């Protein structure tokens, strides 16, 4: 892998010697033991982009990126040596956010040492409204679409609150696009669990839903998310208007319900990029233990506890946040390209006993069908000694591909069984290896003919997709692969 020392654009093609953006000679990334130089020097040259730079004293123009058939509103501010993609929380509105001096200061301070890219998630603010609930997978696609529209090959991803969940998943799935990951007051799960006791109980979440239905348009939740500002009428008025402009009551309620289903705990060990976890000590909305939990499970993550009780990143003491972020980014060092990525592995095999002679025709037809469906669902086919193996960067696409392969094979008179698991993989050319492959292969032995089995790592990441599951309990795959809760995919409501 090579990188431009001027604009930091990364290139996988080792045959390239000069940057396609500005003609600067490319440098090969070396391991940290070989190269201890900082990735971004204080006097690094400004990045040359197709998007015109906007000074920190201006309000940036709102532009649109195309993510599938959805338009995602985004803005670019500043022209620093590193891109930062800011992923907002629950709801947002790009242009009305600037009406708050606190939000404006937050954006401008970040843009003083970076090129800041901000956007409204699909279904909120100035981005297209959608009839279906957005999945984390679709929201990851939106981040990629915005980065591509802004000519950003790699960026530091900064996620706030609910935006941190998709940031965690993005960093694990696309380490080649993620220079580093920063989270602020983020949770890994949004509903109480014996192994995650800090999250709100179902009754507490229901109380929040009731407040949205009855009080949307007022400053809902400001006493918990910004207690230091809750007494200021101007802030209360701005927050109420900001919420109204960000989402309708129905959309806000649907997004809140979807957030309750979020569970990214299984993703954390798969993150392989430099990570900074920031959390305020007395955050009333997301307990500080949730930040500690996340940091403890991301290899090499740095946890910083900040004083204060405000959940909103732009409320309370902003300067302590900027100091930590700027110091973290300025001390990033060149790192070797990671070989491991988070992916959803699909393994399919013929069901029932067959001799080699009997199964050969069916195996050939299954392989042809599976390859075609995998391409349609944007997956990647890999070699497999027995059966069919494919990987996907999105679990929803993987599940729907598995259902499509099963149904297509059945129409052809071929019975199959399949298994899906999301985890770390090593993907090289047409070969895939790693624990995620081993787990999916072991799982398929537990599937009945015609079944598609999914591990909890898949089920937890597809909230809002309309996919239905039936629990099959916890199974001990073997001593090396551990125990996994498995479910049968029962269908798709969409």
Cite the ranges covered by each PLM segment.
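Conserved acidic catalytic loop of the alpha/beta-hydrolase fold
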Residues: 137-155
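Catalytic active-site module of serine/aspartate enzymes centered on a nucleophile-bearing elbow/loop
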Residues: 301-338
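Flexible "cap/lid" loop of the alpha/beta hydrolase fold
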Residues: 168, 172, 177-212
């Amino acid at each position: 892998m090579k990188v431009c020392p001027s604009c930091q654009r990364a290139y996988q093609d080792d045959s390239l010697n000069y940057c396609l953006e500005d003609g600067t000679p490319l440098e090969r990334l070396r391991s940290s033991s070989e190269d201890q130089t900082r990735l971004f020097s204080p006097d690094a040259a400004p990045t040359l982009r197709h998007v015109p730079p906007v000074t920190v004293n201006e309000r940036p123009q709102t532009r649109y990126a195309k993510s599938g058939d959805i338009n995602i509103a985004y803005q670019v501010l500043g022209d620093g040596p590193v891109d930062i993609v800011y992923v907002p929380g629950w709801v947002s509105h790009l242009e009305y956010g600037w009406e708050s001096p606190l939000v404006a200061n937050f954006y401008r301070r970040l843009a003083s040492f970076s090129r800041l890219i901000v956007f409204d998630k699909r279904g909120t603010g100035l981005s297209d409204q959608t009839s279906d609930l957005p999945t984390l997978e679709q929201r990851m696609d939106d981040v990629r679409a915005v980065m591509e529209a802004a000519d950003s090959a790699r960026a530091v991803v900064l996620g706030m609150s609910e935006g941190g969940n998709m940031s965690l998943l993005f960093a694990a799935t696309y380490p080649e696009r993620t220079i580093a990951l920063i989270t602020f007051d983020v949770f890994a799960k949004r509903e109480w669990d014996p192994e995650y006791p800090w999250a709100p109980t179902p009754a507490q979440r229901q109380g929040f839903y009731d407040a949205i239905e009855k009080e949307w348009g007022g400053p809902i939740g400001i006493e918990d998310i910004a207690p230091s500002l809750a007494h200021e009428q101007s802030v209360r008025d701005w927050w109420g208007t900001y919420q109204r402009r960000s989402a309708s009551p129905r959309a806000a309620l649907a997004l809140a319900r979807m957030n309750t289903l979020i569970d990214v705990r299984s993703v954390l060990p798969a993150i392989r990029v430099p990570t900074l976890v920031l959390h305020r000590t007395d955050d009333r909305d997301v307990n500080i233990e949730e930040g500690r939990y996340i940091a403890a499970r991301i290899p090499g993550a740095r946890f910083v506890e900040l004083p204060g009780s405000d959940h909103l990143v732009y409320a309370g003491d902003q300067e302590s946040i900027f100091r930590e972020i700027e110091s973290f980014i300025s001390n990033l060092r060149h790192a070797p390209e990671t070989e491991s990525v988070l992916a959803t592995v699909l393994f399919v095999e013929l069901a029932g006993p067959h001799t080699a002679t009997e199964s050969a025709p069916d195996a050939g037809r299954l392989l042809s069908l599976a390859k075609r469906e995998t391409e349609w669902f944007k997956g990647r086919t890999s070699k497999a000694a027995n059966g069919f193996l494919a990987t996907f960067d999105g679990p929803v696409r993987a599940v729907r591909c598995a259902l499509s392969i099963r149904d297509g094979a059945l129409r052809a008179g071929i019975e199959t069984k399949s298994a899906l698991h999301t985890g770390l993989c090593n993907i090289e050319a047409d070969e895939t290896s790693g624990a995620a492959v081993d787990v999916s292969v072991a799982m398929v032995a537990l599937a009945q003919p015609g079944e598609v089995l999914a591990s909890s790592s898949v089920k937890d990441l597809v909230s809002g997709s309309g996919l239905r599951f039936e629990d099959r309990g916890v199974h001990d795959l073997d001593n090396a692969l551990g125990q996994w809760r498995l479910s049968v995919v029962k269908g798709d409501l969409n």
